[in-house]
C-alpha cells in the first residue's frame, strides 16, 4: 500500500472514505486517479488472502460473478493485488443495510413481502444457473438497497457465505454477551437446512428462503410444529402455505427447483374459503356470553294502558311459494293488462316511447394506410477478398494454431448499429420478441425505454451503439435490413486490417486515445479514429455478435478447411468479438475470442452488419 501525504492508495484508486466492514472484506469508497470515477473496493484481510481453501473458491466465484450483471449482485469491474492483499473493484452503490436492520420496528405488508421474496428468488435462480449458490441465507447475509425510496434485495456474500460460517459466529461472540450470542446463533441456525453440508446448494438455498418468507409473514421462526401462515394471515392473496411448506421439505428433491414458479396467487375461491375458515375458528374460540335480560321498569313508572316491552322478537312466518318452471321464472316483461288503472296515464306513452326505433347513421371507418418505420441506412466498407492469416500465439489456447484462410470480398458496416437504428426495428415488429418467442433485447439493460406504449431513447444516447441485444435480436435486425451478421473469420480479418494482420485494430498497440476500454460507459460511434480500412469501433466500446457458433478447437478445423470458414454447424455458444467499454487491454486484440449463449443479454453486447458482394 502506497502512502502519499497521508492519502491511502490501492493501485490507481485513492481512498475517500471507509464503509461498513463486511464479513470477508474491508470496504472503502475510492476514486480512480485517471478517469475520476468512484468505485467501492472490497479488500480481503491478510488471513483470507493467505488461506489456500478460501482463495481457491474466491478465484472461481469471482470469475463466474464477473459474467453476469444484476442490480442485486456485486458488480465486479476488476480484481487486483497489492502486497499480497487482493482487492475487488466494484461499482459504487447508494449503500445497503442488512435485512435485520431494515425490519427493526417495521411490519411489512404482503405486497412488500412478495416483492422482496420474488426478487430474492430471481437472483438466486440466476446465480444457480452459473453454477454458484448463496448458502447461509439469513437476516444478516441478505441486505436491502434503496432505489427511489423502494427497498430492493442485495446479496453481497454470494458464493462466499458458506466459507464464512465460522468467521460469522466468531464475530458474533466477540461483539455480544454470552446470552445475546446464544440467541443470535440460534436464530441463524434455524435458516440452515438439515443437510447443510450437502453439495446440493440449490436445495439448501430453497430451504432458507422458506424460513425467511415465514419470518417476514409471521414475525417468528418456524420452530417445531409451527402454525401455517394461512392461520395467521387469513386474508392473504398468495398461497404461502404451499410455497413455504414445499421449501421446508426434509427431502432435498421435494423442494422446488424454480422458486419463482412455486409462489402463486390463491384463486378467489381459495381466498374466500380461507376467510370463512378463519371466521369459524374465531367463533369457536369466543366465549359464550350469558344473555342479559331486559331490565323491568318499576310498576309505578308504567302508565295505565301501556304494555311492558318484553324484548321478544316476533318469529317470522315462512311463506310457501308455488314453484314455477324456469321459463316462467325468467319472464320479466310487464303486461300492460297487469298494470293498475291508476298508472295508465303514463305507462302507455312510456311504452310507446321505448318502442320507437332509434335512427343511427352507419359508421364507416376511414381507411388509413399504416406507415411502417423504415430502416436507416449505414455506410459500408468493401473488404477485398484474398488469403489472410488468422489466430495468435500470444493469446488463449482457442486462438491456435495460426493459419491461413481464404475469403471472398464482402461489405461491412463502418460502425456498430446504434440506438436510433434499432428502435426503428422494434417499432416495425411491434415488440421485443421474434415469432419463436426469443427475446431480441431487454430494454432495462439498454438505453431504449418504453413509456406509455412508446419507445424512447434516453437523452444523449441516440448515436451510441445499441446494447442489451441478444444474438437473436442482432440476426433478426440484419435480416430486416437485408444484411447478415459477419462470420468470425470476416470480423477478424476486417479488424486486423486485411492482409496487414495487425495485433490490435488500431495497430501494434492501443491506448485510451484510440479506443473506449476500461471505462464507465459506451461512447457515441465514430468517437475514436478508424482503423486502416475505415472501420470504427472495432476495438472496445461494445462486444459484437458474429454469425458463427463457437468451438474451442475450431481453428484446428479451419486450418484443414481454409476456404470461407463458417464455424461449426451447431453448438451452445455464439461468438462475440472486439472487447467492450469495460474490457482490459488484452481483450481488444484482433484474435481474442469471446462467446456466450445466443439468448444472453448484457449491457456490453451489440453488433454490426455485413453483406455479400454479388
Curated annotation (Swiss-Prot):
Residues recorded as binding ATP, renumbered to this chain, are 19-27, 42
Q: Which residue spans adopt a coiled-coil conformation according to this UniProt entry?
A: none
Q: One Pfam family for this entry, by name?
A: FGE-sulfatase
Q: Which reaction does it catalyse?
A: L-seryl-[protein] + ATP = O-phospho-L-seryl-[protein] + ADP + H(+); L-threonyl-[protein] + ATP = O-phospho-L-threonyl-[protein] + ADP + H(+)
Output the Gene Ontology terms for molecular function. ATP binding; formylglycine-generating oxidase activity; protein serine kinase activity; protein serine/threonine kinase activity
Kindly indicate whether the keyword Transmembrane helix belongs to this entry.
Answer: no
What about PTM?
Autophosphorylated on serine and threonine residues.
Q: Does the keyword Amino-acid biosynthesis apply?
A: no
Q: Which InterPro entries match?
A: CTDL_fold (IPR016187), Kinase-like_dom_sf (IPR011009), Prot_kinase_dom (IPR000719), Sulfatase_Mod_Factor_Kinase (IPR051043), SUMF_dom (IPR005532), SUMF_sf (IPR042095)
Which top EC class applies here?
transferase
Keywords, alphabetical = ATP-binding, Kinase, Nucleotide-binding, Phosphoprotein, Serine/threonine-protein kinase, Transferase
- The chain positions of domain Protein kinase read 13-302
Superkingdom as given in the UniProt entry: Bacteria
Q: What's the family?
A: Belongs to the protein kinase superfamily. Ser/Thr protein kinase family.
Provide the protein name: Serine/threonine-protein kinase pkn1
**Lineage from the top down?**
Bacteria, Pseudomonadati, Chlamydiota, Chlamydiia, Chlamydiales
Amino acid at each position: 500500500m502506497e502512502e502519499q501525504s497521508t492519502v491511502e492508495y490501492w493501485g490507481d484508486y485513492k481512498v475517500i472514505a471507509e464503509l461498513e466492514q463486511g464479513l470477508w472484506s474491508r470496504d472503502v469508497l475510492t476514486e480512480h486517479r485517471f478517469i475520476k470515477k468512484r468505485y467501492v473496493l472490497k479488500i480481503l484481510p491478510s488471513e483470507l488472502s493467505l488461506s489456500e481453501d478460501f482463495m481457491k473458491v474466491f478465484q472461481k466465484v469471482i470469475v463466474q460473478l464477473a459474467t453476469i450483471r444484476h442490480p442485486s449482485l456485486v458488480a465486479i469491474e476488476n480484481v487486483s493485488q497489492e502486497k499480497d492483499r487482493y482487492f475487488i473493484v466494484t461499482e459504487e452503490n447508494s449503500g445497503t443495510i442488512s435485512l435485520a436492520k431494515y425490519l427493526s420496528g417495521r411490519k411489512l405488508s404482503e405486497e412488500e413481502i412478495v416483492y422482496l421474496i420474488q426478487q430474492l428468488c430471481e437472483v438466486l435462480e440466476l446465480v444457480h444457473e452459473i453454477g454458484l449458490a448463496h448458502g447461509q441465507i439469513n437476516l444478516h447475509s441478505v441486505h436491502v438497497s434503496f432505489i427511489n425510496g423502494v427497498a430492493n434485495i442485495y446479496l453481497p456474500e454470494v458464493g462466499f457465505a458458506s466459507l464464512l460460517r465460522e468467521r460469522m459466529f466468531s464475530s458474533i461472540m466477540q461483539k455480544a454477551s454470552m446470552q445475546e450470542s446464544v440467541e443470535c446463533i440460534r436464530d441463524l441456525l434455524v435458516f440452515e437446512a438439515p443437510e447443510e453440508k450437502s453439495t446440493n446448494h440449490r436445495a439448501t438455498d430453497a430451504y432458507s428462503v422458506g424460513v425467511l418468507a415465514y419470518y417476514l409473514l409471521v414475525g417468528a421462526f418456524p420452530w417445531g410444529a409451527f402454525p401455517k401462515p394461512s392461520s395467521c394471515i387469513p386474508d392473504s392473496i398468495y398461497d404461502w402455505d404451499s410455497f413455504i411448506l414445499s421449501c421446508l421439505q426434509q427431502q432435498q428433491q421435494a423442494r422446488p427447483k424454480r422458486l419463482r414458479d412455486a409462489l402463486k396467487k390463491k384463486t378467489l375461491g381459495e381466498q374466500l374459503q380461507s376467510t370463512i375458515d378463519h371466521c369459524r375458528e374465531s367463533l369457536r374460540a369466543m366465549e359464550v356470553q350469558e344473555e342479559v335480560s331486559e331490565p323491568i321498569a318499576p310498576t309505578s313508572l308504567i302508565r295505565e294502558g301501556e304494555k311492558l316491552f318484553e324484548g321478544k322478537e316476533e318469529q317470522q312466518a315462512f311463506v310457501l311459494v308455488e314453484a314455477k318452471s324456469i321459463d316462467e321464472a325468467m319472464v320479466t316483461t310487464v303486461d300492460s293488462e297487469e298494470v293498475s288503472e291508476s298508472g295508465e296515464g303514463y305507462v302507455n306513452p312510456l311504452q310507446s316511447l321505448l318502442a320507437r326505433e332509434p335512427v343511427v347513421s352507419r359508421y364507416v371507418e376511414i381507411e388509413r394506410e399504416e406507415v411502417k418505420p423504415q430502416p436507416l441506412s449505414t455506410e459500408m466498407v468493401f473488404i477485398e477478398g484474398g488469403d489472410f492469416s488468422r489466430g495468435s500465439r500470444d493469446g488463449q489456447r482457442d486462438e491456435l494454431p495460426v493459419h491461413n484462410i481464404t475469403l471472398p470480398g464482402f461489405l461491412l458496416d463502418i460502425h456498430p448499429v446504434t440506438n436510433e437504428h434499432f428502435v426503428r426495428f422494434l417499432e416495425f415488429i411491434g415488440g421485443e420478441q421474434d415469432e419463436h418467442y426469443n427475446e431480441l433485447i431487454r430494454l432495462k439493460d439498454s438505453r431504449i425505454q418504453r413509456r406509455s406504449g412508446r419507445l424512447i431513447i434516453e437523452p444523449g444516447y441516440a448515436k451510441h451503439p445499441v446494447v442489451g441485444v441478444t444474438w437473436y435480436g442482432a440476426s433478426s435486425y440484419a435480416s430486416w435490413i437485408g444484411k447478415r451478421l459477419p462470420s468470425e473469420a470476416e470480423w477478424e480479418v476486417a479488424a486486423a486490417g486485411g492482409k496487414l494482420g495487425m495485433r490490435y485494430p488500431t495497430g501494434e498497440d492501443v491506448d485510451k486515445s484510440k479506443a473506449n476500454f476500461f471505462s464507465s460507459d459506451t461512447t457515441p460511434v465514430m468517437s475514436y479514429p478508424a482503423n486502416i480500412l475505415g472501420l470504427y469501433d472495432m476495438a472496445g466500446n461494445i462486444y459484437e455478435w458474429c454469425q458463427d457458433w463457437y468451438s474451442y478447437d475450431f481453428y484446428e478445423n479451419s486450418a484443414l478447411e481454409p476456404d470461407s470458414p463458417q464455424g461449426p454447424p451447431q453448438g451452445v455458444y455464439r461468438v462475440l468479438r472486439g472487447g467492450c467499454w469495460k474490457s482490459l487491454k488484452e481483450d481488444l486484440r484482433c484474435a481474442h475470442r469471446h462467446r456466450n449463449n445466443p439468448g444472453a443479454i448484457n449491457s456490453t453486447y451489440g453488433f454490426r452488419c455485413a453483406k455479400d458482394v454479388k
